[in-house]
């Protein structure tokens, strides 16, 4: 399967889920690779992002298409919702896209009729800036909670759990979704 569909008037490509993620603490400072209570809480003044290595090829494809000189309008067709908005905004940010007209396609189903309606009625991407801001905020909260509480609980209780389970090392993973399920 090709990674791009080309037509005379359009080029179509896709993300494969998330292409960009928040960087681990050691990308801010290599000393943070070693977990220590003295480095907690980890709260960066500015968040860093990186391309996910396993999907780097697709990111390069999407990035190069978004930045092509002959592309003047981008139709953003990621999932209609906060996470879909976040997926596109991270790609756009990391790819340093600028000077393009950006329209958001918002659809409620995958029928041909609904897709065509979504394209016809696409709105300027800026109308979804609040949704994007909420997605970034949710991601930062998840990141800070996960990084800090996982490290804290692992440092405090990891050895006890390892001894109980008779394993060499135990990481206690904490996160918004995981914690609710537990």
PLM features: what roles do these ranges have?
Residues 2-151, 180:
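Intrinsically disordered, low-complexity regulatory segments
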Residues 142-182:
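Prokaryote-biased recognition of long, low-complexity C-terminal linker/tail segments
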């Amino acid at each position: 399967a090709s990674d791009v569909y080309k037509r005379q008037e359009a080029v179509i490509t896709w993300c494969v889920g998330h292409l960009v993620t928040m960087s681990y603490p050691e990308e801010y400072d290599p000393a943070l690779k070693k977990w220590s209570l003295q480095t907690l809480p980890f709260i960066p003044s500015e968040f860093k992002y990186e391309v996910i290595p396993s999907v780097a090829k697709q990111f390069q494809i999407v990035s190069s298409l978004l930045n092509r000189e002959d592309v003047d309008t981008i139709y953003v067709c990621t999932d209609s919702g906060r996470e879909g908005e976040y997926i596109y905004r991270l790609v756009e940010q990391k790819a340093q896209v600028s000077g393009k007209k950006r329209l958001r396609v918002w659809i409620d189903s995958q029928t041909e009729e609904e897709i065509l309606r979504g394209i016809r009625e696409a709105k300027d991407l800026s109308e979804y800036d609040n949704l994007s801001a909420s997605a970034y905020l949710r991601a930062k909260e998840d990141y800070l909670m996960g990084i800090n509480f996982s490290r804290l609980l692992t440092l405090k209780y990891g050895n006890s759990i390892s001894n109980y389970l008779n394993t060499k090392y135990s990481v206690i993973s904490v996160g918004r979704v995981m914690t609710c399920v537990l």
